């Protein structure tokens, strides 16, 4: 059941794997769109070779080093945007990639894949570094849902594939 409560900074300022699992079943709101998060991946710090911050701080990865609860949106392959939410303490680069949602408003549609999700919702780099803990049309709402999930290797990467840091609702 959807609440009117937007997830707080303290929700995101925790261990990234815990945040990733706990985001499953929560409702992502962007503009007029609402969708239940059903698939995520965790990227954790400079020791994670698949994490964008593995090579350190750059202008592109600046958001990952910032405060928890902010968006980190980037472009891959020069054509697909990806939405992440920054986690853990400021200065430690970690984030959760939102890989899929079940859109239910204004239309019902399953969006599997971060590129499809961002394209349909029109999330772009203009939405980078947005505080998702504030009510401004781009946030994540709490729910009472605690879906069962499976943990699998992350996909679409060439390094760090040994980690079971992709979580998908069952």
From Swiss-Prot:
Belongs to the DNA glycosylase MPG family. Its EC number is 3.2.2.-. This is Putative 3-methyladenine DNA glycosylase. One of its GO terms (molecular function) is alkylbase DNA N-glycosylase activity. The keyword Hydrolase applies. Keywords: DNA damage, DNA repair, Hydrolase, Plasmid. The keyword Ligase does not apply. InterPro entries: Formyl_transferase-like_C_sf, MPG, MPG_sf. SUPFAM superfamilies: FMT C-terminal domain-like. GO terms for biological process: base-excision repair. It is an enzyme of class 3 (hydrolase).
